[in-house]
Curated annotation (Swiss-Prot):
Transmembrane annotation, as ranges: none
Entry protein name: Interleukin-15
The keyword DNA repair is assigned to this record: no
Naturally occurring in which organism (per UniProt): Macaca mulatta
Entry-listed glycosylation sites: N127
Disulfide bonds: C83-C133, C90-C136
Keyword line: Cytokine, Disulfide bond, Glycoprotein, Secreted, Signal
Protein family membership: Belongs to the IL-15/IL-21 family.
Amino acid sequence: MRISKPHLRSVSIQCYLCLLLNSHFLTEAGIHVFILGCFSAGLPKTEANWVNVISDLKKIEDLIQSMHIDATLYTESDVHPSCKVTAMKCFLLELQVISHESGDTDIHDTVENLIILANNILSSNGNITESGCKECEELEEKNIKEFLQSFVHIVQMFINTS
């Protein structure tokens, strides 16, 4: 079973390590290990998180196969690399439409997890300002299948540049 919040995996591993090495914290070397462990818990692990985002997108795609959701979503199909953050924010907003339209708890939970992962990655990159990009409402409306394919494409753009 996959942990639904993979960004917490490294923290839990480091907590176990802390308990294991607890008796050694009385030495100077033990204190250094503890401090370095605390710092490493906060370091971004963007490549792994983007892979988890793609995994969640595939899960959403599988879950909606059995449903009939007749929604059109604003979709950026030809993302310029200088507008990928703006496009990603639009995709994340439209994901909430899928969650609402489906009414399915599995889809809702997967969408929430995906949004948390993506927002954590985007926030770890700092505040990037992009100009000359289309607003979400200016994008072409497409069906859910095309939306998810375009979403995977933009996530792969983030993976390839990290």
